[in-house]
């Protein structure tokens, strides 16, 4: 590629769910979060998704998922006011660019009044690498920019490009039971975006086929490796009453509809489709990517991810509990999340520990994880 693609270089989250302060966390082309259940891995992922939702949909819509800001705010950080100013905001700080030095710095503080009757974006600022910035004032004035609307929603120029990056992030929490069912086809034009649950995978594949037949054929050929007994796998359309898209697998002398396919097959197909898309999202975030997958399929997906990030076409963030998957990665691609003595999530880079770096010469990351060495080093 002639031009290096922008990526999410760092993130810091405060007062969101389990997180009091994540501190600034550097992200690479591939970053994999590991840790015990309840450690706080998902809180960081959900914070990124919530930030995207505020930028795209506004604060009210973003908080509907949590049934109100009071439920998603860290429980130990109640909204208070001092001298007429709100304290303990929920805060997001991100750096997006081709490198940390050449990044646009995004800052957003979200808060509510003490009675939880109103919520608002208390402060927001986007600072370009050249120093030029746009800002939403701390003081809230009636008739000013809508209290729940991000300044990135209508940003132009360099800030507009960063806003496009945020809008294009792809979060996946695949639900195979929904992915196999027929869904209404998108007929208004424009690019088809894969739903978070993967439910519109058939329509997504039809769009890929339209954009780049070679990319589509490559996905089908790769699926033949996953399903060696299958002759073909195609998205189909039905228009008996409503035009709907669905998947159909050709096997021997009969055809199998998408809702009869295995959960692993559907998950692999969706992940391949996102990674092989002719215009992939700048950031792909997948929680517990190993769910429903056999070791061979996990190995295939890790190779696909490695190819994509090395080519610079996308950036990938994963969470996993699979030691086998970890054995396929490098130590510097991992972030361990563990609770400290106060019960607060802390984010550790195992590769920063000299002792672990030595152990990694003899043991793969998955082995170090199951041995407890990663958690010991984080204490």
Language model regions located:
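C-terminal lobe/lid and adjacent interdomain/linker elements of RecA-like ASCE P-loop ATPase modules
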Residues: 1-6, 300-379
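N-terminal pre-Walker A segment at the start of P-loop NTPase domains
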Residues: 1-20
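Hydrophobic anchor at the beta1->P-loop junction of P-loop NTPases
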Residues: 33
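P-loop (Walker A) phosphate-binding loop of NTP-binding proteins
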Residues: 36
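Conserved lysine of the Walker
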Residues: 41
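Conserved P-loop NTP-binding catalytic core
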Residues: 46-113
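Electropositive, glycine-dotted interaction segments
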Residues: 91-93, 97-221, 225
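Conserved ABC ATPase signature
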Residues: 221-276, 283-296
């Amino acid at each position: 590629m002639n031009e290096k693609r922008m990526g999410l270089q760092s993130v810091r989250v405060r007062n969101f769910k389990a997180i009091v302060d994540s501190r600034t966390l550097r992200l690479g082309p591939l970053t994999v979060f590991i840790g015990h259940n309840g450690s706080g891995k998902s809180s960081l992922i959900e914070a990124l998704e919530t930030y995207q939702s505020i930028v795209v949909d506004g604060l009210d819509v973003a908080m509907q998922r949590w049934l109100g800001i009071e439920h998603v705010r860290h429980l130990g950080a109640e909204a208070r006011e001092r001298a007429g100013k709100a304290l303990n905001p929920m805060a997001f700080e991100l750096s997006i660019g081709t490198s940390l030095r050449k990044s646009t710095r995004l800052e957003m503080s979200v808060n509510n009044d003490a009675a939880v009757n109103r919520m608002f974006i208390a402060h927001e600022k986007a600072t370009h690498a050249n120093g030029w910035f746009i800002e939403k004032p701390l003081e809230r004035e009636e008739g000013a920019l809508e209290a729940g609307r991000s300044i990135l929603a209508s940003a132009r120029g360099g800030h507009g490009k960063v806003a496009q990056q945020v809008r294009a992030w792809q979060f996946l929490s695949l639900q195979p039971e929904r992915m196999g069912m027929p869904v209404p086809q998108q007929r208004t034009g424009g690019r088809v975006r894969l739903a978070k649950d993967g439910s519109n995978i058939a329509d997504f594949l039809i769009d890929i086929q339209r954009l780049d037949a070679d990319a589509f054929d490559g996905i089908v050929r790769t699926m033949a490796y996953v399903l060696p007994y299958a002759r073909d796998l195609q998205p189909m359309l039905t228009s008996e009453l409503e035009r709907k898209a669905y998947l159909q697998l050709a096997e021997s002398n009969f055809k199998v509809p998408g809702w009869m396919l295995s959960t692993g097959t559907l998950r692999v197909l969706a992940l391949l489709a996102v990674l092989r898309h002719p215009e992939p999202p700048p950031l792909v975030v997948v929680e517990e990517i190993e769910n429903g997958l056999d070791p061979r399929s996990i190995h295939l997906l890790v190779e696909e991810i490695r190819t994509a990030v090395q080519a610079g076409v996308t950036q990938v963030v994963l969470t996993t509990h699979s030691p086998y998957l970890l054995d396929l990665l490098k130590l510097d691609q991992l972030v361990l999340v563990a609770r400290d003595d106060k019960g607060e999530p802390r984010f550790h880079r195992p590769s920063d520990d000299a002792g672990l770096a030595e152990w990694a010469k003899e043991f793969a990351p998955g082995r170090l994880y199951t041995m407890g060495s990663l958690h010991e080093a984080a204490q």
